[in-house]
Amino acid sequence: MQKKLLIPILVMLVLVIVLMVRGCGNKDASQGDKQDETQDVQTDTFDNTNTTGNDVRTELGTMTANESGGVDITVTADGLQTTYTYTDVAPDAWYADAVNYVVSTGVMSGDDTQHLFQPEYGVERSQFAVIVYRFAGGTPTEEDAEFSDLADDEWYYEYVKWMVGKGLMGGNGGAFDASGFLSCEQAIIVLYRLAGEPTVSGTLDDYPYAPKVSESGRDAVTWAWNNGLITEKECVWYPTQAVSRAQVALLLMRYDALIGRNAA
């Protein structure tokens, strides 16, 4: 009798595990700082509906597989070559080209001491402010960012000031929540604002998680979905999941390919 009961229980456990590893992020941005296991099938990250944007391949460094199973990214700038080694980025990972892009352009980096990019880690709001500032070519501003939880001696204060001054990010209830994790939808909203909130065409009819998109984020997600910034080919783009570093890298590379790097 016990053996008969054990079989369906084991089947259910296997199904649960399969469902857990299919996504590339936590289902809620408040659940933690790491993303779940991602799919290891390489996709062409340049293959999207955009045909009029920039060719961001010109931004890429030379990426080669290393003995650890990771990659070495060699970037040439001002006649000098610098090689970045990441043991946690497989050469055939769906985000490998995107990591190459953000590292080559200086928008993102990893832990050079441990040789880790940490692609599955979540991105804090303060970290995203720094990333977008670099990506868009932000410049220092004299404006203050007045939030109850934001001191002017924080390392990210100047970046947050610029983001807030440009209307790209804001707070909630007078607080900025710098250490809070950004969701996929929130990251997309910021980039939509950076793009100047272009007129939206298309629908979310074929987006699997459309019912989970907030009303305030609907235009941004519709824009991202219909312009190929997010697809279901590489991983799950669940609106409320904590966006991962790999996903941010991919968003930025596709944004650049679509309309170029620009300041708000």
Where in this protein do the model-derived segments appear?
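Sec-dependent N-terminal signal peptides of Gram-positive bacterial secreted proteins and lipoproteins
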Residues: 4-26
